[in-house]
Design a protein with these regions (language model features):
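Intrinsically disordered, low-complexity, mixed-charge
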Residues: 1-79, 84-149
């Protein structure tokens, strides 16, 4: 036997607490990224909530944030899962393109402020259906939707 019943329960409780702490930590990072990105995006004056410049900004900023605070590799993983690597339609291709560009911006940024300014500058230099790896892109205005996501 491995100790008394109260000792076994105490070990189980400690193990459960560790798992709960790990789960809380793992959940806090996505909440941080989504919270900061949506707060910033909602305050922007960019048009096109979905498929437009605002959507491109959201994707670029989220990816830059993850690359800056974590790793560009994490952006690759999320893009592969959420956007199917950009395959399927123009919207997914646009999102994957902006994720890759945002990750590059975040990976090279020297500061949080610079990273955010560089993403906004990339959006301001972007355009509809741009086929340039160094420019943010979005769909034509007739495809924009007035949504947050």
């Amino acid at each position: 036997m491995r100790g008394t019943a109260p000792e076994r329960w105490a070990r189980r409780l400690r193990r459960l607490r560790r798992w709960l702490a790990l789960a809380a930590l793992a959940g806090s990072y996505p909440a941080f990224v989504l919270g900061t990105v949506y707060a910033t995006t909602l305050r922007s004056d960019l048009p096109g909530g979905r498929h437009g410049p605002k959507d491109a900004y959201r994707h670029g900023l989220a990816s830059a944030t993850v690359a800056y605070t974590g790793s560009p590799r994490w952006v690759e993983w999320v893009t592969a899962v959420m956007e199917d690597g950009g395959r399927g339609d123009a919207a997914r291709a646009m999102d994957a393109h902006n994720n890759r560009l945002g990750a590059r911006i975040g990976a090279r940024a020297g500061s949080w402020t610079q990273m955010r300014a560089d993403v906004l500058a990339a959006v301001q230099a972007g355009g509809a259906m741009v086929e340039d790896d160094d420019r943010i892109t979005w769909l034509p205005p007739e495809r924009w939707q007035d949504r947050l996501y």
